[in-house]
Amino acid sequence: MQFIAKLSLIVAATSSLLGALALPTDHMLETRAAAKVYSKCTKPKTVALTFDDGPWYYLYDISKALVAAGAKGTFFFNGDNYGCIYDPENVKRVKHAYDKGHQIASHTWAHKDLTKLSWDQVHDEMWRVEQALQRITGVVPAFMRPPFGNYNDNVKNVAGARNQSIAMWDFDDEDSTGATPAQSKKLYDAAIKKKPSTILALNHDVHERTAHEVIPYAIEKLQKAGYKLVTLAECLGDKPAYQSVGKPSKPDSSWHC
């Protein structure tokens, strides 16, 4: 009887252990390694032109300028900032960026300051836009950029749980803080004059002046200086841009903000 009782305890303990291994919990997600933070490119003579806050009207113009120059960019999309990502026109914009070979990534759902949110709230901001991008294009992004560039350990932990890296920058054209096209151009000129090995540039595709004046100017100046304009993933040494690549979904009633 004692042997049977001991055997029962062993079986129960083993079953409990296997159950715990088979069913990951939120706590297990929280204890994954924190996300890596990248603020500089690593591949020499590359520039990553990145664009936040879209999808919006001027994405097409930026994409056209890049493609015409044999260049690629990276677009960090929101879910519900300048319009809902599920709006038909925004769906087209996201698809266009991806289909043209640009990298697409997460800028969170509603452009909130993540450092003021709880673990669950940050997680919600991240997964909702990831879900939208996967539905629209079939890909799950491997990179995210926190709104305002604000992050803390909590944000790094949630991003790590989502298997994402955090992308920052080492150059800002200051279009989001009111810089005129002339001022943004001078900032690019000053950066190029220093002859850095690489540049990871922050721009915003929601500003007409950026799309029509600054970016065409920057592309020309950067290429004349010998830089290759590539995606973020490429400038980081050809890291995977996406966690997975699949087929897009068809729109249904769940596609709303």
Predicted segment positions?
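Fungal secretory targeting signals
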Residues: M1-M28
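Active-site beta->alpha N-cap acidic-glycine motif
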Residues: H27-R135, V139-P141, G237
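C-terminal domain-boundary segment and adjacent tail
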Residues: A34-C41, A69, G73, N81-G83, ...
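Short low-complexity, flexible loop/linker segments enriched in glycine and/or proline
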Residues: E89-K92, D120-V122, P181-K185, S244-P248
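Structural recognition of alpha->loop->beta junctions
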Residues: A97-H102, I136-V140, R162, G246-C257
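Alpha-helical scaffold elements lining the catalytic groove of polysaccharide deacetylases
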Residues: D99, A110-V139, N150-S197, A211-V214
